[in-house]
Amino acid sequence: MTDPLNIPTAAYRAVLIDLDGTLLDTIPDLAAAANAMLAELEAPQLPLADIATFVGKGTENLVQRCLTDPRVGLPADPATVAAALSVFNRHYHAVNGQASQVYPGVLEGLAAFRAQGATLAVVTNKPTEFTLPLLRRSGLSNWFDVVVCGDTCERKKPDPLPLLHACEQLGCPPQQALAIGDSVNDALAARAAGITVLAVPYGYNEGRDIHDLDIDGIVFGIDDAADWAATRGKHRGALAATDNTNTIGK
C-alpha cells in the first residue's frame, strides 16, 4: 500500500508548456516548408538559422517575415500573404514532424511533473491542423490533458487568453499554474495572466537574448523545470535571468 505521507504534492497544479522551441525542435521542418514555398514563388532561399528567428507568432507571421526579408523582397499585402500561406501550409503538411526532434530532458520532465501530481497542457501559436499531428508523430500526445492551439482562442500569445483558457480547461487558478516557454511571447502572456513563467535557453525567441525577458527563472530543460517546481526556485540547476529574477539557491 502507498504511504499517503509519501504521495508527492505539486508545487503547481498545472503546467502549461509551449511547443516549438520548448518541447520540440521544429525548425528543420518549418525551414523546409518555408524554402519550398519560396522556391515555388521563384524567390531566393533563406538560411535555416534566419528562419528560426521568424518562429513564435504563428505560421502567418512566419510567412510574412519570409516574404518581407530583404533578400526576398516580395510584397506583404493581405492577398499575397494569404496566397503564400496556402503554399506554405501545403508544403508543411508534407514534412510536419519528419525532422522535428524532442529536446533532451522533455520526457523525463513530463514524467516528473506527473509524479508531482500536476496536470499538463500544450499552449502553442501553431494551428491545430499542424499541432495535433505533430504531437502524435513525436509521441507526446498522451502526456497532455489539454492542447490549446493558435486557432483555439480569438487571440494568440502574447495575449494571455490562451494560457487562461488552458487554466480554465484544467480547472486550475492562474496563480497555481506554471508556464514554460522559450520566447518573449510566452513571457508576456504569462505575466499578463498572472502565471509564474520559466524559460528554456535553447529555443528561438526571434533572435533575442532570453536573459532580457521578464520571467521567474531560466532552466536548462523541462526536467530542470520540474526540479525547479518541486523546490519552488531553490534548485541549483537554474540560471539567473535578470537582476530581479528568482534564481536557484537565492
Regions found by a protein language model. Name each.
Residues 10-13, 90-122, 128-132, 160:
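Short, acidic loop-to-helix structural element flanking the phosphoryl-transfer center
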Residues 57-94, 104-107, 112:
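A metal-dependent, Asp-based hydrolase signature
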